[in-house]
Amino acid sequence: MTIRKIIVLTLIFGLTLHAVFLNPSFSEENPRSDISVNSLSSKFPNDWVTTGTSLMYGISDDAGFMVSEDGGARWETRNVGLPVKWIYPYNDAEPRTLTALAVDPCRPERVAVTTARQLFISEDSGRTWREIVFSKPFPAAAFVTAVALSPQEPKAIAVGTAYQGLYETRDFGKTWVNLTPHLQFLYQGAGFYEEISALAYHPQDGKRLIFGCGFGKGLYQLHRESGAVKLSGFDPESTSHITGVYFSRIAGDGKKPEFWQLSLRTRSHTAHYQWDPIQKIGETKHIEPILDDEAVQRRLQASNRFGLYLRPDYASGRRLDEKLSFMKENGLNTIVVDFKDDSGYITYNTSLSFPKQIGAVRSQINIREFLKKAKEHRIYVIGRLVVFKDERLYRYQNCKYAIWDHKTGKPWGHFVKTTDVSGNTVWVQREFWVDPYHADVWDYNISLAQELESLGVDEIQFDYIRFPTDGDLSTATYRYRRKGMEKVDALESFLRKARAALRVPISTDLYGFNCWFNMDSWNGQNMAIFSKYVDVICPMYYPSHFPSAFMKESGYLERARQIYRQGTYRAEQIGRSRSLIRPYVQAFLLGGERKMDKATYSDYLKRQIQGAVEGDASGFLLWNFSNQYYMVTKSLAEFLQKLQGQQDVRSEE
C-alpha cells in the first residue's frame, strides 16, 4: 500500500485570485461581534456555489463566509453578525466553522449558512445576518450538515443533519417539522440515520427537496406527501460523496432556451446537469494542492504502521523480548507505549521537574535503553500521553486544575456505587479529570511531548483528548473557560499549540462514533477540526462498544468487518484526507464475546483487520490492556500480505 497524497481542498480558478478582508474590532464580551480576519491564512473558500451570474458565495474553514461579485476574481469576507470562536493564541476572534451553505436560486441575494448547531439567513448577500432559532422537534444535540432555502416560500428552510435526519420550518423557525419518518431507508439502527450531506429545494415545486447522502449513499428526491425516491441518470462519480446540491437558472442564448442547472459538488469536482430531462453538460475540477513539505514528510513517516499497545511493565527485560519476537512473527513494526498513563503517572525517567513536584513520576521504563532496543529491531515508537484524565494533576494544590462541581463546591468526579468489605454501599471515585480549558494543563502535556521528541520517540499520541462522558455531567463546571468558548475550542487550542511545538508526527485517539459521523457536542471531539493539526487519527472502532442495534442486519463477525471498513472510509472523508487513518483494533473480548471459542475470536480479530485494510487504512494498532494478545492464533504476516495485495489490485482497477 502506498501513502495517499494528503490534500487540502482549496478553490483555484484559472486566473489570479485576490481576497479583500474586513478589519473590524472584537469584544470578548460579545462573542458574535465584528471580527478581524487579517491574520487568517485561507484566502479562498473551500466550498462555494455559483448563482448563474457573476455573484458567488463560499465558506472557508478559516475565513468564514465569503462573497465574490466578479465570478471569483476577488473575494471578501462578510462575517458581521455570525458567530466567532475564541481560541489560542487569543490574538483575534476567528469565525466559527461553517458547516453548510445555501442560496435561493430565484433570489440570489438570499443566502443561508450554518454552524454545527446554529442557522443564519441573509437577505442582502451576507451584509447582515439573522439567526433562525431551532426548537423542538429539532434535536438539541444535532450536528447540522446541510441547508436549503425555498424559492417558492420565503419563510421555508430545510436543514439536514449528520445523524438525526431532516427537518423543515415554513415560518422562519417558529415551528419545525420532522421529515425524518420519510427516510427510514437511511436508518442505521440505535437512533442513528445516514448523514444528509447536501440539500436543495426543487426550483419550481416547493413541496420537493433534492438531497444527497454522505459517504456514497446517493441522491434522492423527497416529496412532502408521497415520500422519497432515489434519483438516477447521474454519473456514479457525481454522487460518490456529495457535499453540495445547488440549482441555478441559466439564461438562454437565442439558440437554447433558459433552463435550470443542477450542480452536484464532491470533494474532487462539481458536475453540472441540465435538470429535467437530466443531461450532463459539464464539470469543474477542483485542484487539490498537497500540504507543505514538513506535513508531507510527517505523514510519510507515520504511514503504514502496523503495531500493538505495550504496557509500561512490558517495556523491559524478558517481557519486552517476548513482545518483540511476537511482533516479528506477525509482521508488526510499531509499538504504542504509555509514557503518561491513565492515572497521570509518568512511566519513564523524566528529567522534567514539574512531574516530580506533583508526585507523578513512577518510572518503569529506562527510556534510553528502551528506545535503543526498539531501534535495533527497526520498531517505530509511539509515545502515548493521556491528557485530560489525570489524577496526579487533579489532586495538585488542593485540586487547582480539577473540573469543579458547582452543586457541592468541590472537585467534580465520576463516582460509582460499590460494596466495601463490610458489605456497606459506598461511592468510589473512578475517574479524575482536569479542566481542558486551562492552558497550564496544555503546557504540561506539551512539555512531556517535547521531551519525548528530544529523546527520539518517533510519534506522539494524545489520548483522552476529550471531555468526560460518564458520571453526573450536569454538575460539572469549567472554571477556566473563557467567555464564548465551547468544548471543541479548548481541544482545538491545545492541538494548535501542540502542533506549533512539535516536529514529529502527532496522532490522536477518538471515539468510534466521532469518526463515523460529524459530531462534537457531547465530548468536544470534532474530527474535521482535529485533522487540521494532527497527522494521524486513530478511531477506536471497537465493535463491542457500538450499540447492539447499530448495523444489526449483519452477523456479528461481518458487522465487525463493516464497522472497520466503512468507518475507515468515513473517517477519511470527514477529515478530507488531511490526516492518515490508523484505527485501533479490538484485540480483547468483552461481555458475551467471552463465550467465543478460539476459532471464532480469531476470525473476529481478522475481520476487523480485513475491514481496516479494505477501507484503505494506513496501518492499525492492536489494543489489549492486559497485553495478552491471545486472539492472534496464527501469524498475521501472511494474512496482511494477502490483504494488501488484494487491496492494491482493487486500487489499480
Regions found by a protein language model. Give the residues of each.
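Aromatic-lined carbohydrate-binding/catalytic grooves of carbohydrate-active enzymes
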Residues: N330-Q364, L636
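An active-site-proximal structural segment forming one wall of the substrate-binding cleft
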Residues: G317-R319, F326, N330, R430-Y464, ...
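Catalytic domains of carbohydrate-active enzymes, especially glycoside hydrolases
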Residues: D321-G344, L455-E459, V536, G615-G619
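Extracellular glycan-interacting surfaces
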Residues: T2, L9-F13, L17-V296
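Substrate-binding cleft of secreted/luminal carbohydrate-active enzymes
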Residues: D535-S548, L557-Y564, R570, S579-Q647
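Aromatic- and acidic-residue-enriched segments that line the glycan-binding/catalytic groove
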Residues: T347-I358, D390-N424, P468-K483, D597
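Aromatic-lined carbohydrate-recognition surfaces of secreted/lumenal glycan-active proteins
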Residues: I382-V386, Q461-F462, K487-N523, R578-F588
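Active-site-adjacent "subsite" loops/lids of carbohydrate-active enzymes
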Residues: R298-A315, F388-E451, K606
